[in-house]
């Protein structure tokens, strides 16, 4: 019975969030079980372009370090904000969500050529947090019961938290920068006088990921919507 409940809950996670989170967990599990090593996964331009180890373009986004506090913290944020985006502003737009993944991953890989980062998964999570926070500007947040602020400040609060823990803020800055570029090109620039939509999801992605339009006369049975994580007043991060 418990297995069926867990399976049902897992299958209710929207597809992109489910696939990415699962890939991250399985990759970390494989490293933990010593089936593979981080040296086979990290971002290395020379190995990618000279030795054709193309898989590193993907695997460097899937490993968040050994199982521990940092891994759990990153997985919680990745799952929550990826799912909230997919169930919120990208609801019914799976192809657009996949295109955001590809665009963000491409930019981070490009910037990764100039900074000494070997794993980009955490920066990718910050990008997701940034886009969600800018699209939900009036949501009130509470950080460990210490700070109250509106959602757009969340990426900067997380960067300050990283700084307090003695971590490099390059990862956070990269995620914020890529998130802002996407948000500007997708949400701001097209709505400016003379602005145009630069980011256009390729039709092949729509063919693969978007379901055909339903018959407008079809009246489906009501179904329970999967529970999201729409944090509002009084909701604590990490608590």
UniProtKB/Swiss-Prot annotation:
It is a multi-pass membrane protein. One of its GO terms (molecular function) is signal recognition particle binding. Widely expressed, with lowest levels in brain and heart. Keywords: Endoplasmic reticulum, Membrane, Transmembrane, Transmembrane helix, Unfolded protein response. Residues 229-239 have a biased composition (Gly residues). It holds the Pfam family DER1. Residues 214-239 are annotated as: Disordered. Induction: Up-regulated in response to endoplasmic reticulum stress via the ERN1-XBP1 pathway of the unfolded protein response (UPR). One of its GO terms (biological process) is negative regulation of retrograde protein transport, ER to cytosol. This is Derlin-2. It comes from Mus musculus (Mouse). The gene is Derl2.
């Amino acid at each position: 019975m418990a297995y069926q409940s867990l399976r049902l809950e897992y299958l209710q996670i929207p597809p992109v969030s489910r696939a990415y989170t699962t890939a991250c967990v399985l990759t970390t599990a494989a490293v933990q079980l010593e089936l593979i090593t981080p040296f086979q996964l990290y971002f290395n331009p020379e190995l990618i372009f000279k030795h054709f180890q193309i898989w590193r373009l993907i695997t460097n986004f899937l490993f968040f370090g050994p199982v521990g506090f940092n891994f759990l913290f990153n997985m919680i944020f990745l799952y929550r904000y990826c799912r909230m985006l997919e169930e919120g502003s990208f609801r019914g737009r799976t192809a657009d969500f996949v295109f955001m993944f590809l665009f963000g991953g491409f930019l981070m890989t490009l910037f990764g050529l100039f900074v000494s980062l070997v794993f980009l998964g955490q920066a990718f999570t910050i990008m997701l947090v940034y886009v969600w926070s800018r699209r939900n500007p009036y949501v009130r947040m509470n950080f460990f019961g210490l700070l109250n602020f509106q959602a757009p400040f969340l990426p900067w609060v997380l960067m300050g938290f990283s700084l307090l823990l003695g971590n490099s803020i390059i990862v956070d800055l990269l995620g914020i920068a890529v998130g802002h570029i996407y948000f500007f090109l997708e949400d701001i620039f097209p709505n400016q006088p003379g602005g145009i939509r630069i980011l256009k999801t390729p039709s092949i992605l729509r063919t693969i990921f978007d379901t055909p339009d339903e018959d407008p006369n079809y009246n489906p049975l009501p179904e329970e919507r999967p529970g999201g994580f729409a944090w509002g007043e009084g909701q604590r991060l990490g608590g």
